């Protein structure tokens, strides 16, 4: 799991930023299956929004 923020003030929870996090650019574990098996707008969007493989895809 990657840290959400460089400052280390963010925590990841279920693939996205933990509730109450005061981060503007939060990034948690990327959903590689989502970007490879589904169509997403961007890898960055998947990394921010995916909680399970492909769950960020429409």
UniProtKB/Swiss-Prot annotation:
Binding positions (a divalent metal cation 5): 34, 38, 56-57
Binding of a divalent metal cation 4, residues: 31, 34, 50, 54
An example Gene Ontology molecular-function term: metal ion binding
Keywords: Cadmium, Metal-binding, Metal-thiolate cluster
Protein family membership: Belongs to the metallothionein superfamily. Type 3 family.
Binding positions for a divalent metal cation 2 per the UniProt entry: 5, 10, 23, 26
Binding positions for a divalent metal cation 3 per the UniProt entry: 12, 17, 26, 28
Alpha, as annotated region: 30-58
Name of protein: Metallothionein
Protein's UniProt keywords contain Metal-binding: yes
Family matches, as InterPro entries: Metalthion_crustacean (IPR002045), Metalthion_dom_sf (IPR017854)
């Amino acid at each position: 799991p990657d840290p959400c923020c460089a400052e280390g003030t963010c925590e990841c929870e279920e693939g996205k930023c933990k509730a109450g996090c005061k981060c503007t650019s939060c990034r948690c574990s990327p959903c590689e299956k989502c970007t490879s098996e589904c169509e997403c707008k961007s890898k960055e969007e998947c990394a921010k929004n995916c909680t399970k493989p492909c769950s960020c895809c429409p």
